[in-house]
Amino acid sequence: MGMRMMFTVFLLVVLATTVVSFMSGRASHGRNAAASDLIALTIKGCCSVPPCIANHPELCG
């Protein structure tokens, strides 16, 4: 294999890696948002229960 061919293969590998990384990052945004919503609901539930407020005052501000 010549230098041009090796460089072309290198560029293709870098491009493929970048595309896969970019697409997997976008796919996880929805899961992160759902997890944040669940955490917020859990904290709100804790703030309405006096024993939970006593154990975790930092959550309820």
UniProtKB/Swiss-Prot annotation:
Signal is among the record's keywords? yes
Q: Which domain of life is it from?
A: Eukaryota
Secretion signal span: 1-21
Main localization category? secreted
Provide the protein's localization: Secreted
Tissue expression per record: Expressed by the venom duct.
| Cysteine amide modification, residue list | C60
Maturation-removed propeptide residues: 22-44
Q: Which InterPro entries match?
A: Conotoxin_a-typ
* Pfam assignment, any one: Toxin_8
Keyword list (alphabetical) reads: Acetylcholine receptor inhibiting toxin, Amidation, Disulfide bond, Neurotoxin, Postsynaptic neurotoxin, Secreted, Signal, Toxin
Give an example GO cellular component term for this record: extracellular region
One molecular function GO term is: acetylcholine receptor inhibitor activity
Record PTM: Is not hydroxylated. Contains 2 disulfide bonds.
The domain comment in this protein's record states: The cysteine framework is I (CC-C-C). Alpha4/7 pattern.
Q: Which family does it belong to?
A: Belongs to the conotoxin A superfamily.
Function, please? Alpha-conotoxins act on postsynaptic membranes, they bind to the nicotinic acetylcholine receptors (nAChR) and thus inhibit them.
Task: Write the protein's name.
Answer: Alpha-conotoxine-like Am1.3
Task: Tell me what organism the protein belongs to.
Answer: Conus amadis (Amadis cone)
